[in-house]
Amino acid sequence: MPRVKGGYVARRRRKKVLKLAKGYFGSKHTLFKSAQGQVMKSLQYAYRDRRQKKRDFRKLWITRINAAARLNGLSYSRLMHGLKLAGINVNRKMLADLAINDEKAFAQLAEKAKASLNN
């Protein structure tokens, strides 16, 4: 039985892995075996962090809204409840943007939330 080396198929597979490993430290970007392990781990991190990014941004928006709400005499939860009672449907991303870039508009929303909480 003749020896089979794999030919261009194996070379193509290895080149694909080494291309993904470009820029890695040490032997992880030159040696196939260590590169393959690192590429697999990197893809796992990428998959996990694409989901975690959504959570992280939501946390950031809530922190910013809470800070701005406290400057206007409300807590985050009371502000959100007041906005819901007032029928103002604004998502957290937009509220956080208003809190940073347009403090007057955010203050007006906070006043409307306060008014709807008092009624």
Curated annotation (Swiss-Prot):
Stored PROSITE patterns: RIBOSOMAL_L20
GO cellular component, one term: ribosome
Species in which this protein is naturally found: Halalkalibacterium halodurans (strain ATCC BAA-125 / DSM 18197 / FERM 7344 / JCM 9153 / C-125)
A single BP term in Gene Ontology: ribosomal large subunit assembly
Gene Ontology MF, one: structural constituent of ribosome
Protein name: Large ribosomal subunit protein bL20
Role noted for this protein: Binds directly to 23S ribosomal RNA and is necessary for the in vitro assembly process of the 50S ribosomal subunit. It is not involved in the protein synthesizing functions of that subunit.
Homology family: Belongs to the bacterial ribosomal protein bL20 family.
This protein's UniProt keywords: Ribonucleoprotein, Ribosomal protein, RNA-binding, rRNA-binding
